[in-house]
């Protein structure tokens, strides 16, 4: 079975972009030979133009979702994540985002607490479903796994644009890079709180959560860190999550976010 390994640099500089872009070009040439079909660079450029427009429209939708109640479920964010990673360069997906923009305008103003979610969404977990599925008091307005790259891409240099997008993805490099990007997202959407779900075994998420907490503390945004299994419901312990989440939401409702939120995190061993 043919296998291709892309060596993605951590450094964000022109030499790194050139290095990865050349790998992508070599991979494209290999695909041409494997499939017996010529590569059409103009189609790639067209897809990048659509991707740029889709990303802008998605941020427009996120801003509207921070203003209006838009009934949905936690799993909806995972569907959106799949679309952003598998269909972002297609006109059909851009049309879907534009439809959602017009649709959300018909819904009432949201008066509850706005949540920015970080990392995996355990959509099957009972307590999380209770508080975030079609709940007019608490609404997840966006998740970092949906828009893990915020770069405007240059369609005139498609391979370099793709290389730069990969290098600047929030999951590449140190966690401080992710913390800065989440901070930019928070500055745009103005959430009332951030919740990060640390999946068991994901050392990057667990180890870097303190860096993100410090970043958000500087922005006066309370943060809750939850631990659990984001994939296998057999390892889901609803009681612990229920206790910590309800205490955090009660703190948000009381309007004393930063001080009590810090105490809550310290009490949980974070």
Regions found by a protein language model. Name each.
Residues 267-270:
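Flexible inter-domain linker/hinge segments
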Residues 21, 25, 29-152, 171:
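A charged, amphipathic alpha-helical module
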Residues 1-41, 143-265:
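Trp/Phe/Arg-rich N-terminal binding region typifying the photolyase-homology
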